[in-house]
C-alpha cells in the first residue's frame, strides 16, 4: 500500500469514528432512560436557579460592607464622633459626669420608679445602671505605705467587702426574726390550750406523751369548748386582717408572686417598705395562731426581703443598693434565709428561693446564698434546744432502715407522683376560680374584714368538727405522720373497724385541702407551702398504710411514703423540683433521694400538662408583670417583628439642641435611642436621659457665656470711644469759635470769603465717613430733614448708611438699611443726638478747610460738577466687610484708623458663632448646634452605650423570650440590616397572651 493510500484509509477511519461514538452514546442514553435517579438529576440540571441574573456575590459583599463600615454616605465626622465616644479620655469624662448627676431626680428615676406610677423595667445588666466604682474588684495600690487608715477605708469601700459584711448580718437578723415568731407562736399555742382546758385530753400534749382516746365520737366534742375554739380563731383572724386594712395592704398573701415580679426587674417600692414588714409579721403570727390553714414560708421570705432592703438603705451598705446586680443577689440571699428560718434546710432553701422567684441565676454567686443560709441555720439549730417544748418543730426526724427497691416499688413512686400531680392541678384550678369569683363582686373585694370574719368562722367550725387531729397545728400533725406509731388522737376509733384508720387520714386530707383553698384567698398574710407539705404527708401515709396492709410492702415504711408524697404534692402545685431537696433535709433521710425525685419529677410533669403553676396563676390574676417560663405554642411561629412597637421615638446625631430639648420635654424616657441620621436610621447607641439634660445645660451655659463676654468687651470699648470723640468734638468746637471771632475782628472781608469758601466746601462735599459708632453719617445739609425723619422713625436705634450718590443716600435714608454690625447694637442707645451730629459735621468741615487737608472722599477732576455728585468712596461698603473705624483727634491733626470686626466668635474646635446669629439672641446661636458636634467638642461627656441590646426583626419570638429571661433585659431594639425599626419592652411581652 502506498503512502497516499494509507493516508486515505486513515482519513476514512477517522471520519467513521464519530459515527461509532455517537451510536455508543445513543445506546448509553437508551439505558439511562430507565434510571429514574439519573433522570431527576438531569431535570434539575436544566432548571435556571437565577432567572433574574442577580449578582449574589456582589450583594453579599455589599451587606458585609454595610455592617463593617456603614452606608456609603456615612461621613468622616460621624466616624470621628463614634471613635471619640470609645476613647479612654471620654470614658473618664463619663465617670466624672456620672458622679455629678447620680443624685439628680432624673437619674434616680432610672432605678426608683414606682410601680404605682408607671411600669419601668430595670435593665440590671446595662452598664448605664451600674456605678463605675462598683466594677472594680481589685483594690488600687496605695503608694503611701504610712496611710493605713486611708488604705483600710478604701478597702472597706469596695463592693466585695461590703457584701461580706452584709451577708452575715442579714442572716443573723432573719434568724432572730424566725426565733421571735417561734416564741410568739409557742406562747399563743399555750394560751389556746389553756382556754380550751376543759377537755384538754383531746389535744395532743406538748410534752410528747400519747393521749388516751375517748370511747365514743360524742365525747370528743363539747359545746363550750367549741365556742371558745371558734371565738379564739375569729379574734386572731380579725387582728390579722386589721393589719392589712390599717397598716399596709401590700402584705396580703404569701408575697412570693410579688418577689417573682421584683426579681424580674419590676420596681415595687412599697412592697418592700417598713409598714409592710410590720403588717406581714404581725398578721402572719395572728393568722397562724387563729388555726387557719396557711403557711409561713411565703411570708417569711417576703419579710426577709424587706429586711434586706432596709439594710441596704443604711449608709454603710449604700454601695450595694447602687448596683442592681448585687442588690438582686442580696435579695436571693434573704429569700434563702427566709426558708432556712422556717424549715432549717439551707441547701433546699437556696434552690427553692432561686427556682421559685428568679428567672435566671448566676451560678458563680451561689456561695453568697450558702453563706447567708449557713449563718441562719447555725442560729436556728442553736435556738431549737430553747424552744423544743413548743408546738412548732422545723425538723422532723424518723427512723428508717433503707431496703432494696424493686420494679414494683418504682412503679408505685410514679403512681404517687401522678396522683399528687392531678391533685395539684385541681387545686390550682379551684384557687383560680375562687379568686376570680371574689374579684367579680365588688362587695367581696372591698369588704375585707367581713369576708375574713365569715370565712374564719366557717373554717373554725369545720376544723373543730373534723376531729382532734385537724385541730392541732400543722407542724405537730407533720410529726404525727412521719412517726412510727399511728397518728393520734383519732376521729374514729381503730378498734371498731380497720378501715377507720384510713378514714381518719382521708378526712384530714379533704378538710385541709378545702380549707387551704379558701384560706389562702383571704386578704391576710399567709402562704401555701406548709399546708401542702403536711397534706402531702397525710396522703403518703394513707398510701403507705394501704400498701402495708393489703400488699405486704416491706421496702418502705408508711412514714417513708409520707415523705415521698409530701414532696410530690408541693411539686405538683408550684411546679418546682427544689421542694424534694428540703424535704430530704427536713426528714434527714437521704436514702429516700431517688423515690422523692421520681415522685417530684412525675408530679411536676403531670401538673404542667393541665395548667400553670400556682404562683404564676396568682401573678396573672393580680396583674403583676412577669415573664413566665410557661408559654403557648404561638411563640414558635411568631417573630420579633410581630410584637415590636414600630412608632419609636428617637434622636439622631444631626438633631439640633432645640429638637433635643423638645424631645426631653415631650417624652419621659429613661434611655433614648440615637441613630446616625434620619435617612440611614443606623442605631449608634442609647443615651441616659439625665446625662443628656446635663450635656445640654453645660453647652448652653458655655455659649451664653461666650456671647456675654463678647458683648461686654465690645460695648465697653465702644462707649469709651464715644466719650473720647465727644470730648474731642467739644474742644474742636471751642477752638473753631475762638478762631472765627478773631477772624471777624481782624478782617471782615476775609471772614466773608472764608464763610463762602466753607459753604462751597460743604455743598461740594457729598459724603463724609465718621467713625464714632462704626456707621457712616450724612453731612449734606439737603438731607437733614430726611435724617431727622429717619431718626424719629427708628427711635434713634439705627443710623442710615451713606452712598456715593445723593439719590442713593436719600433712598437709603428712607429705606432704613443698616449693616449687620449695626443690628448687634440695637439694644444699646447712642449718645449722639441730631444737634451733636450737626455740630460735629461743621467742626470737621472747618477743620479740614482751615488745615488744608484733603477731603476724605476723593473726587475726579472731570466730574467735579455740582449737578453730578458722583464720587468714588475710599472704602466700598458693598465689597468690604463691616469695619470698626476709630478716629483720634488732636489740636493739630486728625488721624483715622480702621479695625476690622471678626466674622465669627471662636468658641472651640467645633463651634464658631457668626455675627449674623447674634441679632436674635442666644437661642438662635446654640439652637442650631447638632448632637454630633457637641459630642465632638468634648465640653462634657454623654453617658452613651454604644452596644445596646438589639435583635433582628425576623428573630423567633421564643428566642426573644429566652433573651429577656436569661439576660434580665428590660427592653431590646429591633433592627433590620442595622437600621432601627422598632423596640420590644418587657411590658409588651408581658401583655402578650402567650
From Swiss-Prot:
Residues in CBS domain copies: 644-705, 944-994
Residues passing through the membrane, by range: 164-184, 227-247, 271-291, 300-320, 334-354, 362-382, 410-430, 449-469, 505-525, 527-547, 554-574
Keywords, in A-Z order: CBS domain, Chloride, Chloride channel, Ion channel, Ion transport, Membrane, Repeat, Transmembrane, Transmembrane helix, Transport, Voltage-gated channel
Region of interest called Disordered, as start-end residue ranges on this chain: 1-33, 715-767, 802-822, 846-872
Protein name (Swiss-Prot/TrEMBL): Chloride channel protein E
Short name of one Pfam family: Voltage_CLC
Function: Voltage-gated chloride channel. Chloride channels may have several functions including the regulation of cell volume, membrane potential stabilization and signal transduction.
Protein localization: Membrane
InterPro entries: CBS_dom, CBS_dom_sf, Cl-channel_core, Cl_channel_volt-gated, ClC
One GO CC term, this protein: chloride channel complex
PROSITE patterns: CBS
Example of a GO biological process term: chloride transport
Molecular function GO terms recorded: voltage-gated chloride channel activity
Membrane topology value: Multi-pass membrane protein
Composition bias type Low complexity, residue spans: 11-32, 717-764, 809-822
Primary location recorded for the protein, binned into one broad class: membrane
Gene of this entry: clcE
Family in the record: Belongs to the chloride channel (TC 2.A.49) family.
Comp. bias regions, Acidic residues: 859-870
